[in-house]
Structures are given as structure tokens and as C-alpha cells.
Regions:
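Cross-family detector of peptidyl-prolyl cis-trans isomerase
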Residues: 2-6, 19, 23-170
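Bacterial N-terminal signal peptides
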Residues: 9-19
Length: 170
């Protein structure tokens, strides 16, 4: 009887120790105050664009929800009558450039061929809705881009703005 009481008390102590450790306030995952401010600035940019309305009172950006986050896009112009959209494996030839919300460029404008499955998830989901001849502005939040780790010159938590024209599906 005495042993079982000690066992129960030991078990309760272990559960409490694990519980207190799990409830720590270190939710910043080691990010600096400067990084957290950058993340928040990028999130605020997305929040503002989500509710932006055009002259007609309609939302300016279409929204694609993917994995609990939202990528935004709008068609800036269209040439031709093509209505077919690519599949996830369709090679898409486009002229593309990439910018941060500060207008600093991270991808110079150039022609490239990519598949929707071969790019960051947010851009891939938007490409599945595009047709040949469309000029598109896509806004990709960090969760649907490169995430919260630095990646080849792209700072952690960056919102990505891609502007591209679909030339052809190969």
C-alpha cells in the first residue's frame, strides 16, 4: 500500500514537471526582438492586402487557403483567350520577378520554366489557377513560402511578392 502511494506521488510529480516545462513562455523559439518585429510587419502586410478593395467595392485579391494560411493574387492583365490551367506537373514557362514587401528585389526578372509542384507551396497553388497570357501579382506569406528560417538570401519570415506573366505550358 505504502509503495503504491509513493508510486502515485512520483507519477504526479513527473506529470507536473513535464507540464510546467511545456508551459514555459519561450514561444519565440529563439528569435530576436528584431526578427519578431520583421515577422509582424510581414503578417500585417498580408492582413492589409486581404481586405483591400478595388473601385468596384470587390476584394482586390483572390485568396487561396492552403494549410491554414492564405496566399493572395490578382490578375493585372491578360492577353489572349486561353482558359486552360496547368496541372501540378505541367511545366509553365513564365517571366517572373520576386520582391520583398520593402520593394527590395530577391529574384531579378527572367524567363524560367517551373512546375507548380516544384515551387513554394503558395505560388504553386496560385499557378494552378492561372492561364496563358495572364500577368499576375502573387503575395505569399512566410508559411507558404520559405518559412521562418533564412533561405538563400531570403530572411526568415519573409512575405514574398511575385509578379509574373505566363507565356506557355510545355
Amino acid at each position: 500500500m505504502k509503495r503504491s502511494i509513493y508510486a502515485v506521488i512520483s507519477l504526479i510529480m513527473m506529470v507536473m514537471a513535464v507540464g510546467f516545462t511545456a508551459c514555459g513562455d519561450d514561444d519565440n523559439k529563439g528569435f530576436s526582438a528584431e526578427q519578431i518585429a520583421y515577422f509582424e510587419k510581414n503578417l500585417e502586410f498580408i492582413r492589409e492586402k486581404k481586405v483591400l478593395k478595388g473601385d468596384d467595392g470587390e476584394l482586390l485579391y483572390k485568396q487561396i487557403v492552403l494549410g491554414g494560411d492564405t496566399a493572395l493574387y490578382r490578375v493585372l492583365g491578360k492577353e489572349g483567350e486561353e482558359t486552360q490551367c496547368p496541372t501540378s506537373q505541367t511545366p509553365v514557362t513564365m517571366i517572373l520577378k520576386g520582391d520583398f514587401i520593402s520593394d527590395q528585389n530577391f529574384q531579378k526578372e527572367m524567363t524560367m520554366t517551373l512546375t507548380p509542384a516544384g515551387v513554394v507551396p503558395g505560388l504553386g497553388a496560385i499557378l494552378l489557377n492561372n492561364t496563358i497570357g495572364e500577368r499576375v501579382e502573387a503575395i505569399i506569406p512566410a508559411n507558404l513560402g520559405y518559412g521562418y528560417y533564412d533561405y538563400r538570401g531570403i530572411p526568415a519570415g519573409s512575405t514574398l511578392i511575385f509578379t509574373y506573366t505566363i507565356e506557355k505550358f510545355n
